[in-house]
């Protein structure tokens, strides 16, 4: 989705406008053996269940982890999951195209009929962008090999999974990593993205012991045509501290089996809406 040049520009702009990344040693993910990174308990929570702050009171955590309620599928969530799968398929198919010459073909089987048009539009958009960039860097001699040209066109290593246990989490799957930055794609409403990105960064730091100082949020809209907006964040002390605060509050709700009660207003897209309001 994002080319090497785009990501480099995003990170450069973040450094200029937000300043250099300054992270206290005690807030690195690899400091998981001591406070404040060390969790109060090891419950294996999913990062996405709390980091974005979609549930103002955290009652969704109580319903899921204490009462064992299962989330109910909603149309926005199903659409987001389907379009994520299309995006990752396009990235994988692009590499097959580069190394084996296999044609890139939009998803067909298994795609709900009401999402087929959006899925095909997204896939074709990504395919045209990536193959066009790939052919350009080869023709212009910016890259001297297929491997280098593929990196220019698609530098994101997709779906990076790490063990979140050192942070008290379950397995953490970041949408991608590129040029030392963690990348997340969103197709629906999003909030607290810098906090969530900090969480992904710290989980990767805990696993590999390498610093992740920047995060990139890509908001994608698919409605007849594809539009996206990418923003880069410096993952300094502030978002890391907010992430740890949110994690500790989530652990407290689950460990204490405390029902925080429903929020005054809940989005109907919440997968626990019907259970919470019943």
From Swiss-Prot:
GO molecular function: 4 iron, 4 sulfur cluster binding; metal ion binding
Keyword Iron on entry: yes
Pfam families: Csa1
Cofactor note: Binds 1 [4Fe-4S] cluster per subunit. May not be required for nuclease activity.
Keywords recorded for this protein, A-Z: 4Fe-4S, Antiviral defense, Iron, Iron-sulfur, Manganese, Metal-binding
Induction section of the entry: Slightly induced by 20 J/m2 ultraviolet light. Member of the csa1-cas1/2-cas4 operon.
GO BP terms: defense response to virus
Keyword Iron included in the entry's annotation: yes
Listed cofactors: [4Fe-4S] cluster; Mn(2+)
Domain of life of the source: Archaea
InterPro entries: CRISPR-ass_Csa1 (IPR009260)
Chain sites annotated for binding [4Fe-4S] cluster: 55, 266, 270, 276
Biological role: CRISPR (clustered regularly interspaced short palindromic repeat) is an adaptive immune system that provides protection against mobile genetic elements (viruses, transposable elements and conjugative plasmids). CRISPR clusters contain sequences complementary to antecedent mobile elements and target invading nucleic acids. CRISPR clusters are transcribed and processed into CRISPR RNA (crRNA). A ssDNA exonuclease with 5' to 3' and perhaps 3' to 5' activity.
Protein family per UniProt: Belongs to the CRISPR-associated protein Csa1 family.
Subunit and interaction comment: Can form a Cascis complex with Cas4 and Csa1.
Protein known as: CRISPR-associated exonuclease Csa1
Highest classification ranks of the organism: Archaea, Thermoproteota, Thermoprotei, Thermoproteales, Thermoproteaceae
